[in-house]
Curated annotation (Swiss-Prot):
Pfam families noted in UniProt: YsaB (PF13983)
Localisation: Cell membrane
S-S pairs: none
One GO CC annotation: plasma membrane
Record lipid sites (S-diacylglycerol cysteine): C18
Keyword Nuclease: no
Membrane topology, as annotated: Lipid-anchor
Main location: membrane
Organism of derivation: Escherichia coli (strain UTI89 / UPEC)
N-palmitoyl cysteine-type lipidated residues: C18
Protein name as catalogued: Uncharacterized lipoprotein YsaB
């Protein structure tokens, strides 16, 4: 009777021990050139000022994110209208999305 419960328990332990852990995924981080990020910020502010018909000084850029092949800058106007500027991997402006 004890043997009937022992074998399934051992089989379960062996099978669990055979599974491989999932591989650790690491994001690639590349240091962005400060001059490039400042140029991208200025271009983003310029495009947002044109879109929202206001001055660049009334535009705040609050976040800068890097993805595999692109960059995004998030910001808002003095009226709290949110937007996202998208750039390609070389830092060229792609588009501005209103949120």
């Amino acid at each position: 009777m004890m043997m009937n419960a022992f074998f399934p328990a051992m089989a379960l332990i062996v099978l669990v021990g055979c599974s491989t852990p999932p591989p650790v995924q690491k994001a690639q981080r590349v240091k962005v050139d400060p001059l490039r990020s400042l140029n991208m910020e200025a271009l983003c502010k310029d495009q947002a000022a044109k879109r929202y018909n206001t001055g660049e000084q009334k535009i705040d850029v609050t976040a800068f994110e890097q993805f595999q092949g692109s960059y995004e800058m998030r910001g808002y106007t003095f009226r709290k209208e949110q937007f996202v500027c998208s750039f390609d991997a070389d830092g060229h402006f792609l588009h501005l999305s209103m949120r």
